Amino acid sequence: MFNPNNGSEFARNRARLDDTPNPYEPEVGSLPEGDRSQAGSDTVNKTGTTIVGLTTQDGVLMASDMRASLGGRVISNKNVQKVEEIQPNAALSISGSVGGAQSFIRSLRAEANLYEARRGEYMSIDALSTMASNLLRGGPFFRVVPILGGVDDDGGHVFSLDPAGSSMSDTYTAQGSGMPYALGVLEQEYSEDLTMADAEQVAAHAVKSASERDTASGNGIHITKITHDGLTTVGHKEFDALL
């Protein structure tokens, strides 16, 4: 049997393969050269954002600013609604890439609608958070950091999620570039016995404080109220009427 050696034209030694791509790369634990997730980040619409979610005696209140930016430097839109209904008793607020957010919302809403069609009832908020987490973890990479809020038979729920698929429940939370400023206000002013009206004032104060210091947040606020009766979202360009 012919045994190729280094001098044979049939030999496949390492020297001859130096310029040939390795079909087995990248290996587990290695990354492609460069951070491709950041490619073109300066031209991608982002909701730099301050978003907050609070549980109340009456349900859940979610709030977000209205600004979208390009690369965190240029304001590309001053009237973005960052809270979207997923089902009549649940909503999702988004910080991060606008395109990723829109795609993720469509996917989660489709799954919720499919569940309702099959079961004849809305998905529980805990199950909805698990579905959202699974989509983030197992689907395409979404550069988004959402807050999920909703009301079911067990009361009001607020969940923080991240692009890696984690899901954490809390009585209040904040996300986005303005999170440090908003959380400071929530830590001082939140209490578990808040009414919806009280929570509206606290959330407005949190978003306003973030908007004053975070260049990627501002241009007004959307307030979303979720109760057993349904979901409503109202936009305000000024904070004075809410404080």
Swiss-Prot record:
EC category: hydrolase
Subcellular location: Cytoplasm
Modulation of this protein's activity: The formation of the proteasomal ATPase PAN-20S proteasome complex, via the docking of the C-termini of PAN into the intersubunit pockets in the alpha-rings, triggers opening of the gate for substrate entry. Interconversion between the open-gate and close-gate conformations leads to a dynamic regulation of the 20S proteasome proteolysis activity.
Propeptide: 1-48
Annotated catalytic residues: 49 (nucleophile)
Single GO biological process annotation from the record: proteasome-mediated ubiquitin-dependent protein catabolic process
EC identifiers of the protein: 3.4.25.1
Chain spans, region Disordered: 1-46
Primary location recorded for the protein, binned into one broad class: cytoplasm
Catalytic reaction(s) noted: Cleavage of peptide bonds with very broad specificity
UniProt cross-references to PROSITE patterns, sorted A to Z: PROTEASOME_BETA_2 (PS51476)
Keywords per UniProt: Autocatalytic cleavage, Cytoplasm, Hydrolase, Protease, Proteasome, Threonine protease, Zymogen
HAMAP family: Proteasome_B_A (MF_02113_A)
Quaternary structure and interacting proteins, as annotated: The 20S proteasome core is composed of 14 alpha and 14 beta subunits that assemble into four stacked heptameric rings, resulting in a barrel-shaped structure. The two inner rings, each composed of seven catalytic beta subunits, are sandwiched by two outer rings, each composed of seven alpha subunits. The catalytic chamber with the active sites is on the inside of the barrel. Has a gated structure, the ends of the cylinder being occluded by the N-termini of the alpha-subunits. Is capped at one or both ends by the proteasome regulatory ATPase, PAN.
UniProt family annotation: Belongs to the peptidase T1B family.
Protein's job: Component of the proteasome core, a large protease complex with broad specificity involved in protein degradation.
NCBIfam families according to UniProt: arc_protsome_B
Protein name as annotated: Proteasome subunit beta
Source organism (scientific name): Halobacterium salinarum (strain ATCC 700922 / JCM 11081 / NRC-1)
